Amino acid sequence: ADDRNPLEECFRETD
């Protein structure tokens, strides 16, 4: 998700 959106990766990690 980092390649498309760094924020999305953060949200997905905190689920």
Curated annotation (Swiss-Prot):
Coiled-coil region(s): none
GO CC terms in record: extracellular region
MF annotations from Gene Ontology: L-amino-acid oxidase activity; toxin activity
Cofactor: FAD
Listed GO biological process terms: apoptotic process; killing of cells of another organism
Source domain of life: Eukaryota
UniProt entry keywords in alphabetical sequence: Apoptosis, Cytolysis, Disulfide bond, FAD, Flavoprotein, Glycoprotein, Hemolysis, Hemostasis impairing toxin, Oxidoreductase, Secreted, Toxin
Main location (coarse class): secreted
Tissue: Expressed by the venom gland.
Enzyme class: oxidoreductase
Subcellular location as annotated: Secreted
EC numbers for this chain: 1.4.3.2
PTM: Contains 2 disulfide bonds.
Role, per record: Catalyzes an oxidative deamination of predominantly hydrophobic and aromatic L-amino acids, thus producing hydrogen peroxide that may contribute to the diverse toxic effects of this enzyme. Exhibits diverse biological activities, such as hemorrhage, hemolysis, edema, apoptosis of vascular endothelial cells or tumor cell lines, antibacterial and antiparasitic activities, as well as regulation of platelet aggregation. Effects of snake L-amino oxidases on platelets are controversial, since they either induce aggregation or inhibit agonist-induced aggregation.
Protein family (similarity comment): Belongs to the flavin monoamine oxidase family. FIG1 subfamily.
Subunit and partners: Homodimer; non-covalently linked.
Designated name of the protein: L-amino-acid oxidase Bco23
Organism this protein belongs to: Bothrops cotiara (Cotiara)
